[in-house]
Swiss-Prot record:
Disruption phenotype: RNAi-mediated knockdown reduces infection by West Nile virus (WNV) and Dengue virus type 2 (DENV-2). Keywords: Endoplasmic reticulum, Glycoprotein, Membrane, Signal-anchor, Transmembrane, Transmembrane helix. Its main location: endoplasmic reticulum. It holds the Pfam family SPC22. Residues 34-179 are lumenal. It is a single-pass type II membrane protein. Signal peptide: none annotated. This is Signal peptidase complex subunit 3. It is found in: Endoplasmic reticulum membrane.
């Protein structure tokens, strides 16, 4: 006969193997789902100022101010394998110095069970919209889009971009009044 330790080891090893197979099966049940949804983004107010960036240097850089509206329904994304969503609004633009600039302006965490219908009006950005030069003034091709990371119970950590983005332009003159 086998000892108690040998039987215990076999039982624990078998249990862990079954749990690993179940976890993988659970992951497979949601890996091919489409997590995209529509997002309506609109800019309400857009300003650009040329101010010193004391965090990086004393040179003047462009600082953008964007007020936006955001409407989307994320309830269809939640299933048994979605623990939470990490949403973030990104601005993407080109300058003569850089082909691709991406700046995260706003973020939010939505837990399972929270209200996943977003209807925000006149929202200010959560983070500063700094450019590393003077590339915001009169920039006519800035796009805003909503993305999210899905935090699952088991499996991959997908990054998903919403369908629909908003294009806007910065004014040709710097704002002189205080914001």
């Amino acid at each position: 006969m086998h000892t108690v330790l040998t039987r215990g080891n076999a039982t624990v090893a078998y249990t862990l193997s079954v749990l690993a197979c179940l976890t993988f099966s659970c992951f497979l049940s949601t890996v091919f789902l489409d997590y995209r949804t529509d997002a309506n983004i609109n800019t309400v107010r857009v300003l650009v100022k040329n101010v010193p960036d004391y965090g990086a240097s004393r040179e003047k850089h462009d600082l953008g101010f964007v007020t936006f509206d955001l409407q989307t329904n994320l309830t269809g994304i939640f299933n048994w394998n979605v623990k939470q969503l990490f949403l973030y609004l990104t601005a993407e633009y080109q300058t003569p110095a850089n082909q691709l600039n991406q700046v995260v302006l706003w973020d939010k965490i939505i837990l399972r069970g929270d209200n996943a219908v977003l209807d925000f009006k006149n929202m200010n950005t959560k983070y500063y919209f700094w450019d590393d030069g003077n590339g915001l003034k009169d920039n006519r091709n800035v796009s805003l889009y909503l993305s999210w990371n899905i935090i699952p119970n088991a499996g991959l950590l997908p990054s998903v971009q919403a369908t629909g983005k908003h294009l806007f332009k910065f004014p040709a003159d710097y704002a002189t009044s205080s914001i």
